[in-house]
């Protein structure tokens, strides 16, 4: 179906009191404006909407699966070498003055296995976006966890919030805050954001009442599970009589997914990209009677083709003269991490020593719990937590025990107790892990009920008390239930947190008191140290007997 006739049907439907819900693919841009260059063939319809007589409000995610695990093996449609060649070509065009910035993208593809709604639930849970959408058109299913508002219309008020500027999330709170500040102060990202915001101002100016275009927010930093994003807000008063086709012709595709200037950048995109974008970087949304509307930019979005049992997911970044190929490629990988990361349906956890009615290192436990809650976006009230623990302790008569405190995402606290007599503290046997952990795994830096890394390590070496972990650079990290300490010539050393390990509260206490020194420890050094200890706030120092482990086969 042609683009304008399709939107005329949408306009007719809303004029007759119906709601229209659907999507417009990136390749529809040529249908709005013929000189906007795109691919001419794709499996998806260019425009697809369905109509409803009424709309219902539902609780988001109420009918979706509660847990999700990725089932697809994703393959890039482009090699790193080809990616680099395309970035170099874009930079040459910038050098020649033909463009200032180009949004360069590629696809991840996979055979689709599993349930479409389960896949959608996983994306929503992993991305925590305000514009999630599930559209089932029979053969074609579009699932989106977009964080970016394309435009919203409420009466005569029009608002757009272009998103341009990205930095990966840190692995723990302090690193995370440092990365946020780096994005906010990044000259490259600020320049990109201003460029795209100016384009949006100009595009919206076509639709707006004279003098009404404003930019109330510039360089706002928004937090998402895998990345920090920089956004700006553009507002205007919509002129009388603007139809949905007028709005799309003026604004589509969103400037944040093309580059500047739009026409030449889209020509370059058509030259360097290998395949059509489809729904990716198009838009998804609804428009209702009277013209109220909300559309997202279709990023963090996948297209499932049921006939082919195939799923397609796009990623990209804005290439400028100052771009680093490695940094841009890493940004694309960061944006794709929501496809790979494990289900984050876990509680935050603290394991606490209770002695004679007193909690050992209570403030440090609270500090770590609060830090992780802030990082993951969990609800946490420190005073409520203190009173809950205090009330629990008052009811206990055991002189020495271990408390296990769990904090849910909604802020609910649960506590259970284990008598200390059942805890082995004299010495433990241990062996080196059979394979390395990934130092970039964020779960390593937070104490949670997701113990999959440690459970896997323990399962590979049975008949041993503990497993000593190391990362992909063969740097020793920690044990499954405690931090690593080694003694060398009378001094005590422990690996730095950046190697990929939990910042233990007893470890922090010992470092602050000058009894422990941070130092990178290599896997091949372990046999030459004088003594090895496992430490945590319940057991304190436990001597380790390191043995050669045998893999369970």
Residue ranges and their predicted role:
Residues 1-351, 355, 469-471:
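Extended alpha-helical targeting/anchoring segments
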């Amino acid at each position: 179906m042609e683009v304008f006739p399709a939107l005329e049907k949408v306009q007719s439907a809303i004029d007759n009191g119906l709601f229209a819900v659907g999507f417009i693919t990136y390749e529809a841009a040529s249908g709005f404006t013929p000189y906007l260059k795109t691919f001419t063939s794709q499996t998806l319809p260019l425009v697809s909407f369905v109509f409803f007589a009424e709309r219902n409000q539902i609780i988001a995610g109420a009918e979706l699966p509660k847990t999700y695990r990725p089932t697809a093996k994703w393959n890039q449609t482009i090699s790193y070498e080809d990616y680099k060649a395309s970035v170099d070509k874009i930079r040459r065009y910038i050098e020649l003055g033909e463009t200032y910035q180009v949004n360069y993208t590629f696809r991840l593809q996979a055979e689709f296995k599993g349930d479409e709604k389960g896949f959608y639930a996983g994306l929503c849970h992993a991305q925590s976006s305000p514009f999630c959408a599930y559209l089932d058109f029979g053969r074609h299913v579009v699932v989106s966890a977009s964080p970016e508002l394309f435009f919203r219309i409420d009466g005569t008020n029009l608002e757009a919030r272009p998103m341009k500027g990205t930095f990966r999330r840190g692995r723990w709170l302090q690193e995370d805050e440092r990365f946020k500040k780096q994005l906010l102060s990044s000259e490259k990202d600020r320049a990109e954001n201003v460029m795209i915001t100016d384009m949006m101002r100009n595009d919206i100016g076509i639709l707006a009442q004279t003098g009404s275009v404003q930019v109330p927010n510039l360089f706002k930093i928004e937090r998402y599970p895998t990345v920090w994003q920089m956004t700006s807000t553009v507002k205007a008063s919509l002129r009388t009589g603007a139809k949905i086709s007028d709005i799309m012709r003026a604004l589509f595709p969103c400037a944040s997914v093309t580059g500047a200037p739009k026409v030449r950048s889209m020509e370059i995109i058509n030259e360097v990209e290998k395949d059509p974008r489809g729904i990716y970087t198009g838009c998804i949304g609804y428009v209702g009677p009277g013209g109220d509307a909300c559309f997202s930019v279709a990023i963090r979005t996948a297209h499932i083709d049921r006939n082919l049992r195939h799923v397609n997911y796009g990623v990209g970044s804005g290439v400028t003269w100052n771009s680093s190929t490695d940094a841009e490629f890493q940004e694309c990988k960061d944006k794709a991490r929501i496809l790979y990361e494990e289900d984050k349906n876990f509680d935050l956890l603290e394991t606490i020593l209770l002695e004679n009615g007193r909690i050992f290192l209570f403030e440090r436990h609270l500090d770590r719990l609060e830090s992780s809650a802030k990082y993951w976006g969990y609800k946490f009230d420190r005073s409520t937590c203190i009173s809950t623990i205090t009330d629990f302790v008052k009811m206990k008569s055991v002189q020495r025990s271990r408390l296990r405190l769990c904090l849910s995402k909604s802020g609910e606290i649960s506590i259970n107790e284990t008598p200390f007599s059942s805890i082995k503290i004299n010495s433990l046997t241990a062996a080196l892990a059979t394979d390395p952990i990934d130092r970039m795994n964020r779960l390593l830096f937070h104490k949670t009920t997701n113990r999959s890394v440690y459970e896997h390590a323990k399962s590979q070496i049975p008949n041993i008390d503990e497993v000593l972990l190391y990362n992909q650079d063969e740097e020793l990290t920690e044990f499954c239930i405690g931090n690593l300490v080694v003694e060398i010539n009378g001094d005590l050393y422990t690996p730095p947190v950046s190697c990929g390990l939990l910042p233990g509260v007893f470890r922090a206490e010992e470092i602050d008191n000058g009894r422990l020194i941070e130092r990178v420890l290599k896997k091949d050094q372990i046999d030459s140290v004088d003594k090895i200890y496992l430490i945590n706030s319940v057991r304190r120092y436990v001597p380790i007997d390191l043995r050669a482990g045998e893999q369970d086969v």
